[in-house]
């Protein structure tokens, strides 16, 4: 399994299950330029079509395969492809010239939080991408693995929804935990 290409995924939750779970959005990873590109695009297309029938939006997740470089050129192409397939929003990663990726993508972008970072660094990431045009962040590890996840979620929300700088949000976080 370790040497297998993990970009060949299947849709784990069909539309009926998403409806039963009262899902607000469905997400599908896409592996543009990787071995699993065709199957991931097929999964995305089917999910978008099912979501459209029931008014459930689909988020296209730009995954980066092992052999892929995290360049602004790659992210600009991959986000554009996913958006033009019909997703309502795209999840991608921060990169050099990120504001160009946002400008080239016709739907809102949220940014993945990536690996677990210290709280101040995660808030800096959130601030940087929001200030460059991202509409939100998806920071699972950086919130759930924080020693103070509720306060960290509140600090991230301050950046995304209230215009706090990373420094202001970190100060807010520190005040909340002490």
Please state what every model-predicted region is.
Residues 1-111, 116-139, 154, 158, ...:
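Alpha/beta enzyme core
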Residues 141-145:
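A short, acidic, flexible beta-alpha connecting loop/helix-capping segment that sits on the rim
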Residues 149:
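Short acidic, glycine/serine/threonine-rich loops at helix termini
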Residues 175-178:
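Extended terminal accessory/targeting regions
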């Amino acid at each position: 399994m370790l040497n297998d290409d993990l970009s060949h995924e299947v849709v784990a939750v069909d539309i009926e299950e998403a409806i039963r779970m009262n899902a607000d959005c469905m997400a599908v990873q896409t592996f543009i330029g990787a071995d699993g590109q065709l199957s991931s695009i097929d999964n995305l297309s089917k999910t978008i079509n099912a979501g459209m029938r029931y008014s459930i939006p689909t988020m296209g997740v730009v995954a980066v395969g092992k052999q892929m470089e995290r360049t602004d050129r790659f992210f600009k192409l991959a986000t554009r492809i996913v958006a033009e397939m019909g997703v309502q929003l795209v999840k991608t990663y921060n990169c050099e010239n990120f504001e160009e990726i946002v400008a080239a993508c016709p739907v809102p972008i949220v940014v993945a939080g990536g690996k677990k970072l210290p709280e101040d660094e995660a808030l800096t990431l959130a601030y940087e991408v929001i200030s460059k045009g991202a509409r939100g962040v998806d920071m699972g590890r950086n919130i759930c693995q924080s020693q103070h996840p509720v306060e960290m979620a509140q600090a991230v929300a301050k950046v995304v929804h209230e215009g706090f700088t990373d420094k202001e949000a970190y100060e807010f976080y520190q005040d909340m935990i002490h």
